[in-house]
């Protein structure tokens, strides 16, 4: 059934652009690396994850290090396990003062049908982090609700949005239905977050981007 958008992402899209990322379907950590460090994955080996190679032992120039020199406190937040992509150790080498993962969030009981912690929990964590310091903050937040895999069987009891007509492939209909319902809930989260930040008693700049397209059997022509 049709469902109006919450206008959460619509508000953000008033100032939008295009971002070329180095991965499709997976590889969030490599998009993270490029956006945090400013370095292209073209300088690394084919299929390499800097989080698992050079950053397993070395530090790296990054936005957090630059901002720390300007008096900022630097934080990373992620509603997933800290060891995923070795973030537990990598983020300190990228210059983050703190890293809050799901292990340190008070209530992670609200999860998707496939077990990912829903993104609305991030609003409180972001505000809590802003409140915890006197200096300006740089907060890099990674959401996980829309993560795959995407079920090929119906897993939502009463979906807000239903999907049909995916090239006569019923299983793909269920995958897209699951995905778009997660995006719908994430849109509501964005609206809640932007509302909270609009009322925050400090100047705030919010930048959002997508790390990669979903794993939906997309072909090259679908990416053009």
Could you describe each region identified by the protein language model?
Residues 1, 6-224:
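Solvent-exposed soluble domains appended to multi-pass membrane proteins
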């Amino acid at each position: 059934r049709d469902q109006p958008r919450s206008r959460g992402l619509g508000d953000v899209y008033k100032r939008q652009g295009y971002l070329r990322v180095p991965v499709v379907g997976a590889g969030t950590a490599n998009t993270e690396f490029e956006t945090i460090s400013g370095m292209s994955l073209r300088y690394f080996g084919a299929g390499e994850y800097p989080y698992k190679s050079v950053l397993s032992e070395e530090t790296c120039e990054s936005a957090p290090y630059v901002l720390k020199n300007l008096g900022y406190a630097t934080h990373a937040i992620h509603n997933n396990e800290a060891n995923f992509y070795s973030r537990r150790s990598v983020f300190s080498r990228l210059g983050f003062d703190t890293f809050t993962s799901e292990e340190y969030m008070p209530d992670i009981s609200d999860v998707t049908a496939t077990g990912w912690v829903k993104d609305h929990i991030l609003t409180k964590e972001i505000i809590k982090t802003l409140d915890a310091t006197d200096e300006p903050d740089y907060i890099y937040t990674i959401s996980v609700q829309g993560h795959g895999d995407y079920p090929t069987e119906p897993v939502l009891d009463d979906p807000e949005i239903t999907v049909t007509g995916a090239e006569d492939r019923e299983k793909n209909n269920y995958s897209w239905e699951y995905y778009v319902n997660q995006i719908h809930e994430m849109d509501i989260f964005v609206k809640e977050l932007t509302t909270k930040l609009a009322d925050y008693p400090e100047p705030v700049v919010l930048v959002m981007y997508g790390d990669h397209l979903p794993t939906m059997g997309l072909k090259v022509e679908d990416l053009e």
